[in-house]
C-alpha cells in the first residue's frame, strides 16, 4: 500500500535512542511491533484485567485481549487513510504495557501512594510507566536497556503526561517524546500533537473499550440491555439491530448492537479525519504535528470522546 505524504514513513523516522543497522526484510516500525510482542511486559498483560478480576471468568477482557482488539481496529482505520499500519499496531500493542492490575483503581491507588511518599511527585501515570517499560525496564539486549523503539512509537505510547513529568523526561532527552507536553506555543518550533498514527491508536483504544466494556458488563450480570438502552447511542443501535433482524434476542442482539456501534464509530473516525485533512492539507508528518485542525481529530463529532 502506498503511504499518504502525511503518514509516518519508517525511512524518515527520527530514529532510535541507540543507533542500530537496518533490518534487511523488516521496516523499523515492524521491528518495533515484533519487539513489543516478544517482550516480557507484553506477556504479563494476560493477567491484568480491565474491569473484572482475572479469576472471575476466562471470557472477560484482559489488557492483552484488549490490546489485540485495539491493534485490529487501528490497522483497519489506518489502511483506509493510507497511514502506516505497522506503526499504529506497534503503538496499540504497547499502549497498556505500564498499566496496573485492577484497572484504573490500581492506578489511583499507586498514584496516592507515590504522592504520600513524595508530595512533590507528579504521581503515577500508566502511559509514562509504559514508556519506562520500553525504554528501561525490559532487559533483553546486550547493548542497552529497554527495547530501543523508534521515536514515533515512543511518541505514540506517551498518550498523556503531566507537565512536571514531561519536564523530567525533557531534562534527560531534550526535544524528545515529551516535548509537546512542555511547550505548546501556537506556530512555535515544537508540535501540538503526535502523528496521525498515534492519534488513531488512541481513538481505537477508546472505541474498543467503549464497546467491549458493555459486553463484559452484560456477561457479568451487572448490566442488562434494558439498562443500557437508557444510553442514547446504545438505544439507537439496539433498535437498528432489531429493525434489520426482527425478533433478535439475547447475546446475538447484544453482539449485533455492539457491532453496529463499532462500525459507526470507525466510519466516524475515518470521515472526521478526512475532513480535518482536507482543511489542513498537511504535506508531511511534521505539518500534522503542528496543525491545529488535526489536533481536533479526537473529537469525532462527540460520538467517542
PLM feature segments, named:
Residues 116-124:
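Aromatic/His-enriched, Gly/Pro-containing loop or helix-boundary segments
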Residues 81:
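Basic, low-complexity intrinsically disordered segments
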Residues 1-67, 71-77, 85, 123, ...:
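Histidine-centered, transition-metal-coordinating active-site segments
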Amino acid at each position: 500500500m502506498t503511504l499518504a505524504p502525511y503518514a509516518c514513513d519508517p525511512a524518515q523516522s527520527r530514529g532510535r535512542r541507540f543507533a542500530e543497522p537496518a533490518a534487511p526484510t523488516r521496516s523499523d516500525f515492524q521491528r518495533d511491533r515484533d519487539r513489543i510482542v516478544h517482550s516480557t511486559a507484553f506477556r504479563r498483560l494476560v493477567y491484568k484485567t480491565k474491569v473484572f478480576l482475572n479469576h472471575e471468568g476466562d471470557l472477560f477482557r484482559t489488557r492483552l485481549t484488549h490490546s489485540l482488539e485495539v491493534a485490529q481496529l487501528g490497522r483497519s482505520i489506518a489502511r483506509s487513510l493510507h497511514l502506516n499500519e505497522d506503526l499504529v499496531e506497534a503503538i496499540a500493542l504497547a499502549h497498556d504495557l505500564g498499566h496496573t492490575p485492577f484497572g484504573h483503581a490500581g492506578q489511583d491507588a499507586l498514584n496516592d501512594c507515590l504522592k504520600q511518599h513524595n508530595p512533590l511527585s507528579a504521581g503515577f501515570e500508566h502511559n509514562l510507566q509504559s514508556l519506562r517499560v520500553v525504554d528501561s525496564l525490559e532487559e533483553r539486549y546486550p547493548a542497552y536497556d529497554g527495547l530501543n523503539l523508534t521515536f514515533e512509537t515512543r511518541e505514540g505510547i506517551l498518550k498523556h503526561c503531566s507537565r512536571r513529568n514531561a519536564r523530567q523526561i525533557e531534562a534527560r532527552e531534550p526535544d524528545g517524546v515529551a516535548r509537546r507536553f512542555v511547550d505548546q506555543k501556537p506556530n512555535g518550533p515544537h508540535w501540538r500533537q503526535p502523528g496521525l498514527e498515534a492519534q488513531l491508536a488512541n481513538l481505537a483504544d477508546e472505541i474498543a473499550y467503549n464497546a467491549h466494556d458493555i459486553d463484559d458488563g452484560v456477561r457479568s450480570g451487572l448490566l442488562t440491555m434494558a439498562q443500557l438502552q437508557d444510553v442514547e447511542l446504545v438505544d439507537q443501535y439496539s433498535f437498528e439491530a432489531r429493525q434489520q433482524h426482527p425478533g433478535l434476542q439475547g447475546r446475538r442482539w447484544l453482539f449485533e448492537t455492539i457491532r453496529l456501534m463499532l462500525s459507526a464509530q470507525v466510519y466516524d473516525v475515518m470521515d472526521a479525519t478526512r475532513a480535518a485533512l482536507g482543511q489542513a492539507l498537511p504535506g508531511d508528518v511534521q505539518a500534522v504535528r503542528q496543525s491545529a485542525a488535526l489536533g481536533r481529530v479526537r473529537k469525532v463529532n462527540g460520538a467517542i470522546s
